[in-house]
Regions:
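Short Pro-Cys-Gly-centered "Cys-loop" motif that presents a nucleophilic cysteine in a tight turn
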Residues: 1-148
Length: 148
């Protein structure tokens, strides 16, 4: 790995700075995040069809293939009483455009690695972790000016 780091002018570990995560409220936020993740290759212009992207779980969530490594989330299972109804409901969700506001919110929570969900969820995370789980402003507070 040291040779690769020298060759490419990198420092640190190979995965340093690449992995980001945030806690997600199960209610409706899980499916919003599913859509965000599975539509990322489309936004990045890697594919026109998210189900065709090799490293995506989209084709499994649409019932087009089985993947033994995936465990369906209860929110996804609640989309329908059988696999066909779930697949159709998920296809409808994927076809709905994500609002710019939702995209920005997910990106900000992910970048800051903060809890994404309703206020009650963030309050619960605050209480259990004894740490602030909300979004912080992107600027540093000004220092008070010296008094003459």
């Amino acid at each position: 790995m040291a040779l690769l780091s020298v060759r490419h002018g990198r420092t640190g570990t190979l995965w340093e700075g690449r992995y980001k995560a945030c806690l997600v409220d199960s209610a409706d936020y899980v499916l919003r995040c599913y859509r965000y993740i599975e539509l990322n290759p489309v936004r990045a212009r890697l594919t026109d069809n998210p189900a065709a992207y090799r490293w995506s779980s989209c084709s499994a969530n649409l019932g087009q293939r089985r993947h033994s490594a995936l465990t369906p989330h209860p929110c996804w299972l609640a989309l329908g009483s059988d696999p066909i109804k779930r697949s159709n409901a998920y296809r409808t969700l994927l076809d709905e455009a994500l609002s710019d506001e939702l995209l920005a919110s997910i990106r900000l929570h992910l970048q800051q690695q903060r809890a994404l969900g309703h206020d009650a969820f963030r309050a619960m995370v605050d209480a259990k972790t004894r740490r602030f789980a909300g979004i912080r402003p992107a600027y540093r507070p000004r220092k008070p000016s010296p008094v003459d």
